[in-house]
Amino acid sequence: MKHQQAAAPKFFSKKRCIILSVIALLLIVPIVVITQPKIADKLSFLINSVRLDRSPGESAFPDIDTANLSPTRQKIISLAKTEFKAQSAGTKFSQGAEEAWCANFVSWIMYQAGAPLKNPHTGGWRIPGTFTLREYYEANGQFKPANSGYQPLPGDAAIYRNSPVFGDHTNIVLKNDNGVLTTVGGNEANRIRVFVNRDKQYDGLLGYGVPTDN
């Protein structure tokens, strides 16, 4: 009996330690995330991936009338269709780099279509981040804010920030049917996907990068 009474405090002591440890973790983790941008970026990427996994994708590339589009826009749509069918790995568009590749996909398509972007930091055609991508289009007078009344055309690059559908993302406009956008994007659930925004969920849509038409 004495032995059982002596053991009771140890049990409660262990339980108390576990509770205190859990509380400490709950307090420490948010501080680490806030003070360590790289960790925050990785967590944001994981959250965005979950959002994308839940988004429906189309199994076929849509029919698009390109007759009245500029040659550059026609090339953009043609290249996007080819890559959608090929479903290549993201490293094809990122020059071999293992990284989030939605902006790399847009950069590669524009480069191959004869309307290359120019990274303000490296001078190269590839812009791997959506923030820099937007800055590039703005600096060159090619950015159309979402609230400007501009109606996007096939071949425009849509750019998002904290979108409930895409997170921080960019993809290419394929169609605009009375406000229902059909887009094709890289790194959507780690693949190239066609998405029809039937619910018109455009919260977080910053605007559009307009390609230089040759």
Where are these regions (language model features)?
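N-terminal capping segments
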Residues: 36-119
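General helical structural elements
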Residues: 18-20, 77, 85, 195-197
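Cysteine-nucleophile amide-bond enzymes
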Residues: 1-73, 210-214
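Alpha-helix initiation/capping motif
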Residues: 102, 129, 198-199
